[in-house]
Design a protein with these regions (language model features):
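Receiver (REC) domain active-site loop signature in two-component systems and cognate sites
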Residues: 77
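C-terminal catalytic ATP-binding subdomain
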Residues: 1-14, 125, 130-134
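Acidic, metal-coordinating helix/loop segments flanking the phosphotransfer/catalytic sites
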Residues: 50-70
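Conserved acidic carboxylate
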Residues: 28
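Charged docking surfaces used in two-component/phosphorelay signaling
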Residues: 35-43
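Active-site residues of response regulator receiver
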Residues: 74
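Hydrophobic/aromatic residues positioned on beta-strands within the core alpha/beta folds
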Residues: 101-103
């Protein structure tokens, strides 16, 4: 499960971020995880495009290389995993921030591919920190 329901959304925290001019590519193969992450991103007014696997993410970036301010990338996905997708995206757009989302506590981020990582379940404050760091 992606969300931490123990801590309700703090309206003051999300009101500090306004990403209405930013487009984020959310890459996640689990529908519930996708919905929860999209909920958090909508709370800060981000424009969200979705991809359900790494191959779809690569195609979206190929179509419009400068469209996205950030990519949030699941690691374990069908067709093409997150690491492979990030490698392909780096060839198209070397400077786009890519943040790994992983439920694996032992995921070791390859810093030449990913800029950062966030563990699942996603914590809203940690996600907002990532958003502030890379796109705000």
């Amino acid at each position: 499960m992606l969300i931490n329901w123990i801590h309700p959304i703090d309206k003051q925290d999300t009101s500090k971020l306004d990403l209405k001019d930013k487009r984020i590519l959310l890459v996640e193969d689990n529908e519930i995880n996708m919905e929860v992450a999209e909920f958090y991103l909508n709370a800060v007014h981000a424009n969200v495009d979705k991809a359900w696997n790494g191959l779809e993410a690569v195609e979206k970036v190929k179509e419009q290389p400068n469209k996205y301010s950030l990519i949030l990338m699941d690691i374990m996905m069908p067709k093409m995993n997150g690491d492979e997708a990030a490698k392909c995206i780096r060839k198209i757009h070397p400077s786009i921030p890519i943040v790994a989302m992983s439920a694996q506590s032992e995921y070791s981020m390859n810093q030449t591919i990913m800029n950062d990582s966030i563990s699942k379940p996603i914590d809203e404050q940690k996600l907002n920190h990532i958003l502030s760091k890379y796109v705000a």
